[in-house]
């Protein structure tokens, strides 16, 4: 089989992977605090016993775009926005600690505070609030609850959000969408981040996604055209091979 088919096939496969990343970004254009996943294509020379005349392509995801999203005023007491390098600690499905910029906190029927289904971690573990209580969040992350029918002066703290600080280069996104410390960062900062008492949150405000929907749509169209071009290359090479076989059979 002509080597050009392998080259075009590899390019088409990686273009599909790149399009999947773009589609994921586009799907999260309205997710609070979402950080767009970066993607790129790079050339990979084919090495072997023969001359290095071929170059394949592979897709790579160098990380996330840490550009802050726009702040949206919601007036919802359980919505919080963080400073640029601040993160909220949450518990992932395997019980490990992860971090998110999504400040849309929800209250489960059990009173558990969650973000996108992940329990919110406080300085003493996962946070739960009394059923039906009115919840407020202070600038330092302290969560207070007022039980139904109680006077306003009986507001009591029930926990404090674990606010941590990390730069974009220190964390990486997992398959569940939650960020964790990279292996290099764990070597210097430990397996989990410690709470930073200097961080502050803004209650009633949400940071929006930093995905540019128009640019993402343009990338989707460009990826589709690249894929179509690679398919035409494969078809052309196959046609040429068929015609060559016909000529050989005639001789």
Describe each model-derived feature in a short phrase.
Residues 1-251:
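Amphipathic alpha-helical polymerization modules
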